[in-house]
Amino acid sequence: MTSSLPSGQTSVLLQMTQRLALSDAHFRRICQLIYQRAGIVLADHKRDMVYNRLVRRLRALGLDDFGRYLSMLEANQNSAEWQAFINALTTNLTAFFREAHHFPILAEHARRRHGEYRVWSAAASTGEEPYSIAITLADALGMAPGRWKVFASDIDTEVLEKARSGIYRLSELKTLSPQQLQRYFMRGTGPHEGLVRVRQELANYVEFSSVNLLEKQYNVPGPFDAIFCRNVMIYFDKTTQEDILRRFVPLLKPDGLLFAGHSENFSNLVREFSLRGQTVYALSKDKA
């Protein structure tokens, strides 16, 4: 039986139903490229994840071969597809008030400081972390203009768009108190029931921007009283981790805090930081 579809449509259908081959050589090239561009180290067991995420890019571009896709990337170092490639391979697991023990430490530190208290969320993902920081500072310091500011960044431009929107499912805010939910969020009605949006009064204190932590210099409005860089260093090798931590040093004020993820340990990487608490590091006053 012959197909009644035009040949072009038949080709597209075949792409959608057939599993494309990802050779060892192509997987190694992908690992090299994402390491060069974003510093991310992909282990062999991530191969299925890489396939499932990048095959969507191939199909969106009408390509049926990973080699052609990689050659297209390498042929134009300024192609917009590079950002799509990075977005596809970054992992964004986050939640409001994740690793909750950090936030009372942040609040206490903020109350003891003078002037505008500034925080950088260096892996902001879809916004849950920077908004959790903002809620903590609003509760601790109030909402007077110029009292505090949160700068939030990520390499993934797609998650930053969601973060800027400030829209979340109500079910994602279970870690907030009823008072915080009422004070800092608006509930959706009608077709938007079950959704909430960050109130503009809080959102005004949070600034979002795209930053690649591999850059030699960060275009960020430091220095900061605290930096949150949680659950992102685990994707980098030790050399890259050390380089990033050294770039953080001049961006922190004396006795500034660095918050790390639960599985990250920076104690033996950079001598300027000393352990202050559970996954919390302080910049030595004489090293700033």
UniProtKB/Swiss-Prot annotation:
Q: What is its EC number?
A: 2.1.1.80
Question: What GO CC terms are in its UniProt record?
Answer: methyl accepting chemotaxis protein complex
Query: What keywords does the record list, in alphabetical order?
Result: Chemotaxis, Methyltransferase, S-adenosyl-L-methionine, Transferase
Query: Catalytic activity annotated for this protein?
Result: L-glutamyl-[protein] + S-adenosyl-L-methionine = [protein]-L-glutamate 5-O-methyl ester + S-adenosyl-L-homocysteine
- Please list the residue ranges annotated as the CheR-type methyltransferase domain: 15-286
The signal peptide here is none
Xref: InterPro entries? Bact_Chemotaxis_MeTrfase, Chemotaxis_MeTrfase_CheR, CheR_C, CheR_MeTrfase, CheR_N, CheR_N_sf, SAM-dependent_MTases_sf
UniProt keyword annotation of Cytoplasm present: no
The reply on keyword Methyltransferase is yes
- NCBIfam families found in the cross-reference section: PRK10611.1
Question: Known PANTHER family for this protein?
Answer: CHEMOTAXIS PROTEIN METHYLTRANSFERASE
Quote the protein name from its UniProt record: Chemotaxis protein methyltransferase
Q: Native species of this protein?
A: Salmonella typhimurium (strain LT2 / SGSC1412 / ATCC 700720)
